[in-house]
Design a protein with these regions (language model features):
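N-terminal periplasmic/intermembrane-space "pro-region" immediately following the signal or transit peptide
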Residues: 2, 7, 21-99, 110, ...
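Outer-membrane beta-barrel "beta-signal"
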Residues: 35-38, 162-174, 397, 466-478
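Short loop/turn motifs that connect adjacent beta-strands in outer-membrane beta-barrel proteins
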Residues: 53-67, 78-80, 112-121, 134, ...
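Residues that define the transmembrane beta-barrel architecture of outer-membrane proteins
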Residues: 63, 101-107, 156-161, 238-242, ...
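Residues on the lipid-exposed face of transmembrane beta-strands in outer-membrane beta-barrel proteins
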Residues: 69, 107-113, 163-167, 198, ...
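Transmembrane beta-barrel strands of outer-membrane/channel proteins
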Residues: 71-75, 123-127, 196-200, 257-261, ...
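Surface-exposed coil loops of outer-membrane beta-barrel proteins
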Residues: 137-155, 159, 172-280, 284, ...
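Outer membrane beta-barrel transmembrane domains
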Residues: 284-286, 301-335, 356, 363, ...
């Protein structure tokens, strides 16, 4: 039954629907009012270019235009699970009034053009439709589908996902050839270079990249596996931000730094475009290396967020003074600072197999703009199907363990709730995630994936769960 449902939604019209985005989205202005119940996080488009080994001077001249598109459909189900009680932001059983089905459908056009020497412009109109379990994105520290929204969005909504300018300044070194791809024009560049991007995009387009786990449309779907779960990256309620990113490529090293806007009120659409009051600063250093003849990379990230947020301790103190349950929504008294760091490692074992690992941490004293995670460790592996004559298939297996701070634990134990979690009580244990998937290439550009996730202590509550999630995903790209 599940297979019939997803296959019925794949159909050949996916390509036509994807391309048809260009017309309606260009008509819709970004100034249109947007329902705040919108995307939590957008699937990233990696900024690190795909580079051929060396540029050949007789190659074609720089590409002037680029058009690509994608469409992804994900359907999921969950089992009934142990649930002695629940609260306002709990993941619910079907018997408790929550549907056991969830789906997402996205379609994006990636349009690019060369403006001048080293100058490029990119625009991404996008469509989204879908709903989380029960219509609200609640009940987990790290959600099981990276394309999920904060609320139901039926019928589809159209919007401008990205619109930004990129300027590349050569600094010498060997000449390399950048391959054509989404938000990437083909052409020669200096291996040592400075790249500046300005406009609207997603934070994860630039930061926390990993070859083996970075895109929920094609790889692992759980937030704690395709990203640093404790990284408080800048994002409005749709998962996008505004700002400036600088990238310095020098030999085997890459340094990235950015100031990016966050909402003036947490988890809304209103970004502070001044970049002087509500923002996130982040710096990431990457080193590319070879280990036993196989490529790998190590990335270190530091971030600092300043925004109008409540602290858990202020909410607890206010609740005690008023004799009420603590509530972060009534304890936003001014600007707060949240900071943290992360480590990201990828390593090829051979041409078909790769390993990845991430560690991230934040101080966890304030409400979150992203996920209710203050510390997270994840690792896993992916394997191509060459050994069974399916070289474009991929199987993945990953594990993550997430935690929250002592102040958030105390807040939740007193009956408080955040944007995403709150069971009215809490028997704290770390949330654990096991995910495995198999992605099969059924046509040249069409991939079908089966996904399974087992989550223990959902929303850090040992009194509830574990929960099993079953998913099917169809992804097409042109």
């Amino acid at each position: 039954m599940l297979a019939r449902r997803i296959l019925g939604n794949i159909r050949l019209q996916l390509i036509g629907m994807t391309l048809s985005l260009l017309a309606p989205t260009l008509v819709h202005s970004q100034s249109n009012q947007v329902n705040p119940l919108t995307l939590l996080a957008e699937a990233p488009v990696p900024s690190s270019p795909t580079v051929l080994a060396q540029f050949n001077p007789v190659d074609d001249p720089p590409e002037q235009w680029s058009i690509h598109a994608q469409s992804t459909y994900i359907i999921g189900q969950k089992n009934n699970f142990n649930s002695p009680y629940y609260g306002q932001n709990s993941l619910l059983n079907k018997s408790e009034g929550s549907g056991n089905d969830s789906f997402t459908w996205s379609a994006t056009a990636f349009l690019g053009g060369r403006l001048w020497e080293g100058g490029e412009f990119y625009y991404n109109p996008e469509m989204f439709e879908g709903t989380p379990f029960g219509g609200s994105l609640v009940g987990l520290g790290a959600f099981q589908n990276g394309e999920l929204q904060k609320g139901s969005y039926i019928p589809p909504t159209f919007y401008s996902a990205r619109a930004f300018i990129r300027q590349t300044i050569g600094l010498g070194g060997e000449r390399e050839h950048i391959e054509d791809g989404p938000n990437q024009l083909a052409g020669p560049v200096d291996s040592n270079r400075l790249v500046v991007s300005y406009g609207k995009f997603a934070s994860l387009d630039f930061f926390d990249q990993n070859k083996y786990s970075h895109d929920p449309r094609t790889q692992f779907q759980n937030f704690a596996l395709f990203s640093m779960a404790a990284y408080g990256y800048a994002a409005d309620a749709k998962g996008f931000t505004y700002g400036v990113v600088g990238e310095w490529y020098q030999g085997d090293w890459t340094l990235r730094a950015a100031r990016l806007a966050v909402p003036t009120t947490p988890n809304t659409m209103e970004l502070n475009y001044s970049l002087t009051q509500d923002y996130t600063n982040q710096v990431e250093l990457t080193h590319q290396h070879e280990l036993w003849g196989q490529p790998g990379a190590v990335r270190g990230l530091f971030f600092q967020q300043r925004a109008f947020m409540a602290s858990y301790q202020d909410a607890i103190n206010q609740g005690y003074q008023l004799g009420l349950t603590p509530n972060i929504l009534t304890a936003r008294f001014g600007e707060q600072n949240m900071w943290g760091y992360g480590l990201n490692v990828e390593q090829a074992v051979n041409e078909d197999m790769g390993l990845f690992a991430r560690w991230s941490w934040n101080n966890g004293q304030t409400e979150t703009q992203t996920l209710d995670v203050s510390s997270s460790l994840s690792f896993g592996t992916t394997l191509k199907g060459s050994n069974w004559s399916r070289p474009n298939d991929t199987i993945g297996l990953g594990y993550a363990i997430n935690g929250i701070s002592a102040s958030e634990i105390s807040y939740l134990q007193q009956g408080g709730y955040t944007m995403f979690i709150g069971d009215s009580a809490l028997s704290y244990k770390r949330e654990q995630v096991i995910e495995t998937y198999y992605s099969a290439q059924v046509f040249k550009n069409l991939y079908i994936s089966a996904d399974f996730q087992h989550i223990t202590n959902p929303a850090y509550n040992s009194a509830r769960g574990p929960v099993n999630f079953y998913g099917l995903r169809a992804h097409i790209e042109i």
